[in-house]
Design a protein with these regions (language model features):
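Conserved GNAT acetyl-CoA-binding A-motif
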Residues: 123-127, 137, 153-172
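Conserved N-terminal entry element of GNAT/NAT acetyltransferase domains
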Residues: 2-55
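Conserved active-site alpha-helix within GNAT-family acetyltransferase domains
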Residues: 155-159, 168-193
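Active-site rim helix/loop that mediates acceptor-substrate recognition in acyltransferases
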Residues: 40-78
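Conserved acyl-donor/pantetheine-binding loop and adjacent beta-alpha core of acyl/acetyltransferases
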Residues: 71, 75, 88-129, 174-176
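Conserved acetyl-CoA-binding loop-helix of GNAT-fold acetyltransferases
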Residues: 127-132, 138-154
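Conserved beta-hairpin
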Residues: 22, 78-93
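Short, solvent-exposed beta-strand-terminating loops
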Residues: 25-40, 93-105, 152-153
Length: 204
């Protein structure tokens, strides 16, 4: 059962104090089997209007992406959870306040549908991305991170969790938003859809 996680797995919120672990993960662990995405640093989804900034910046340079990540984490604009096994970082989940992220680069260019790019009256926590170490996939780490995020969102007064899985099956890399099956485990329900993605919600 994928929800029976290993006893040595721990989940921690990303804070400036865990910045070094975050950088180490993206520089040495996250994409060792996918050099195309090496050192991505997951800067596309964050709580700032960075669409024009990132479009003009030389984001093909990993050092530029690294600098943005450091700045965003120190300002609490890039949020989520880090997963550890035996105190070694093995996973990342990007999740943030939906309304705060409507004008970030990822929302505009990756979700890319104006119909759902509207401020919500409800308090909603969005799930944007998962990355798990290649040798740790299939062991329930993404499931554990999502479970923790749901628990915290409810405690923080959020009314819904929202997610954006691909409509069509694709490889694990382009399933970075989490596969549909992951959300079905936690009873996410269809809310609407875009051309390429389902929009799911879970009432908290």
């Amino acid at each position: 059962n994928e929800r029976c996680y290993m006893n040595n797995l721990t989940i921690h919120k990303l804070t400036p104090g865990r910045l070094d672990d975050y950088l180490y993960f993206f520089e040495n662990v996250a994409h060792t089997d996918n050099k195309k995405w090496d050192r991505c640093y997951c800067t596309n989804f964050c709580a700032t209007n960075n669409s024009r900034i990132l479009k003009k910046a030389n984001m093909s340079d990993p050092d530029v992406r690294r600098a943005f990540a450091i700045d965003y984490i120190n300002k609490d604009l890039l949020q989520g959870y880090l997963a550890y096994v035996d105190n070694n970082v093995v996973g990342w989940m990007n999740t943030n306040d939906r309304n705060d992220c409507l004008y970030c680069y990822g929302w505009k260019h990756l979700i890319a549908d104006w119909r759902i790019r509207k401020r919500s009256k409800e308090k909603i926590k969005s799930v944007f991305c998962f990355t798990v170490a290649p040798n740790m996939r299939g062991q329930g780490i993404a499931t554990a991170m999502l479970e923790r995020a749901i628990k915290d969102a409810k405690s923080d007064g959020y009314e819904f969790m929202e997610a954006y899985p691909n409509k069509e099956d694709t490889d694990m890399y382009y399933n970075y938003g989490g596969p549909l099956g992951l959300y079905k485990k936690f009873d996410f329900e269809p809310f609407t859809e875009t051309k390429w993605r389902f929009v799911l919600r879970k009432k908290l």
